[in-house]
Amino acid sequence: MKIAVLSRNPRLYSTRRLVEAGTERGHEMVVVDTLRAYMNIASHKPQIHYRGKPLEGFDAVIPRIGASVTFYGCAVLRQFEMMGVFPLNESVAIARSRDKLRSLQLLSRRGIGLPVTGFAHSPDDIPDLIEMVNGAPLVIKVLEGTQGIGVVLCETATAAESVIEAFMGLKQNIMVQEYIKEAGGADIRCFVVGDKVIAAMKRQAKPGEFRSNLHRGGSASLIKITPEERMTALRAAKVMGLSVAGVDILRSNHGPLVMEVNSSPGLEGIETTTGKNVAGIIIEHIEKNGGPNMTRTKGKG
């Protein structure tokens, strides 16, 4: 197969591993810089051009679209879909998962466990918003944040009011969530491919920190997940419409709670921690499921 990898940087661990795994299995792997691809949309034959030449003959595309280029990246991916190229994750699903609020609303509608979450626009509603999530301590998250940036733990209601007011003053969209103390600064990253959780790791925040992101100095270790956690991760990925996803789960006193569903999960942490060939499993998934015009939305956007 001829497989495109949409990635800004061919030297990134995840991109390198996907290219290696695909090449080992006999595929032609081509890394395409997402922002350098440009499109002819209105022609009778949809096309993508790259460095002066049309991109042609691709069987599948693996999107590794960073949060900062979601809009343009999804447009390029959608164009691949219009050309009948099989996407590992569809543009519709990626756009859906990048909207944190929309994601939580969809997961909530399907009865998937979530931390109590509040969202408001007016500063006048802050006291009631804090009450709604069971008061302090609570967590405030900027909707556009990634890798733990823009996430604040407020120990008191007074501190929470000040932080929420500050974010609102900066015209930042934020959500307020209950703090799950019993999780102890740890979460579980479940790596979903197709209809299986193929690997899982526990991420523990460093001492004095509550954000467990590996980018924030958290440490990763092997973990055995429960059947309920496995089912929660699979259901969350399915609700978002993602074939490959990193589902972040907290262990709470009332069962597993989904924090986030990541449509472009990094491979380095999970491969290093579990010793599994995750990139190879992803390529196998494409071999089994890929084919011309195989998007679930049938390229309708």
From Swiss-Prot:
Its cofactor is Mg(2+); Mn(2+). It is an enzyme of class 6 (ligase). Mn(2+) 1 binds at D248, E260. Mn(2+) 2 binds at E260, N262. It comes from the Bacteria. GO terms for molecular function: ATP binding; metal ion binding; ribosomal S6-glutamic acid ligase activity. One of its GO terms (cellular component) is cytoplasm. Its EC number is 6.3.2.-. Binds 2 magnesium or manganese ions per subunit. Keywords: ATP-binding, Ligase, Magnesium, Manganese, Metal-binding, Nucleotide-binding, Protein biosynthesis. SUPFAM superfamilies: Glutathione synthetase ATP-binding domain-like. ATP binds at K141, E178, Y179, D187, R211, S212, N213. Gene3D superfamilies: 3.40.50.20, ATP-grasp fold, A domain, ATP-grasp fold, B domain. This is Probable alpha-L-glutamate ligase. The gene is rimK.
